[in-house]
Amino acid sequence: MATYLVGDLQGCYDELQRLLEKVQFDSTQDQLYLVGDLVARGDKSLECLRFVKSLGKSAKTVLGNHDLHLISTALGIKKVKVRDRVDAIFHAPDFEELIDWLRHQPLLVHNEQQNFLMTHAGISPDWDLATAKQCAHEVENVLRHGDYHNLIENMYENRPDRWHDDLQGLDRLRYSINVFTRMRFCYWDHRLDFDCKLPPESAPEELTPWFNLANPLYQTIPIVFGHWASLVNTTTPNNIYALDTGCVWGNRMTMLRWEDKQYFSQHAVKNYRDF
C-alpha cells in the first residue's frame, strides 16, 4: 500500500492517468490525495471529476478556488468563463450529482496516521492545528448542510484580510475560505495579499510567502498544498510540500509518494493556454 499526493489537475486528465500508470497505482490498495482545483482551463475537467469521484474511499481531495467557482456557476451566482472549458460538465447527465459530490469535499485533510496536513493554498500563520481544523469544519458544515448558496454568493471578497479570534459569521467563513483556497503571500503583520502571484524572489519586499512566517504549526506537521504554480523553482522549508508545478500552463504535473518522499512527474501533453 502506498500514499500518493498530486498537484492541481485543472482538467489535465491525461497527465494524471500517465502518472498513475508510472507508479502502478492500485485503487484497491493505494491512496490518492489531491490538493484541489480538479477543474478549469484544461480540456478534461469532466473526466477529472468523474475519475476522482469513482475512486471512492481510495481518493481524498480538498476544495480549491476553481472548484468553488464551479459550484458558484452551477448555482447561477457567477457566469461560466470560456477559458475555464467546463461546458462539458454542465451538459453531462450526471452534472447535479458531480456538483453535489464536489460541494461535500473538505477544505482540510489531516492524515493523523502518516502525519501530514493537506489543503489547497495553505494554513493561516495565526492558526494552530485545532483552529485550522475548526475553521475548516465551520465552512464545510455550511457547504454540506447549511445555506451554502448564501455563503458562496458572499465569498468573493478580500475582507477581512487578517485573523482575529472574535471573527464571526460570513466574515469568519470568508477569511477561512480565502486562506484555504486563495492565499499565497502575506504582509509581515499577517494580512493576506491577493494580488501577487509571482515567485517569492520576484515579489515586492513587503510580501512574504505564508509558509515563511513564524508559526510553530509549520514546523510541527508537514503541510502539502498546491495553488501556487510559480513556486516550481522555489525551495520551500522543510515540512512544506508545494505540488502545483503548472501542468495546465504547459509545464508538468507532480506526484509525491509519501512513504519514501519520491517525486514523479509528467510533462503536459500540450500547453492548454494555446487552445
Swiss-Prot record:
GO MF, any single term: bis(5'-nucleosyl)-tetraphosphatase (symmetrical) activity
Keyword annotations: Hydrolase
Pfam families xrefs: Metallophos
Catalysed reaction equations from the record: P(1),P(4)-bis(5'-adenosyl) tetraphosphate + H2O = 2 ADP + 2 H(+)
SUPFAM superfamilies in alphabetical order: Metallo-dependent phosphatases
Matches recorded under PANTHER family: CYTOCHROME C5 (PTHR40942:SF4), PTHR40942
Function: Hydrolyzes diadenosine 5',5'''-P1,P4-tetraphosphate to yield ADP.
Source superkingdom: Bacteria
Protein name: Bis(5'-nucleosyl)-tetraphosphatase, symmetrical
Similarity remark: Belongs to the Ap4A hydrolase family.
EC number of the protein: 3.6.1.41
InterPro entries, sorted: ApaH (IPR004617), Calcineurin-like_PHP_ApaH (IPR004843), Metallo-depent_PP-like (IPR029052)
CDD domains noted in UniProt: MPP_ApaH
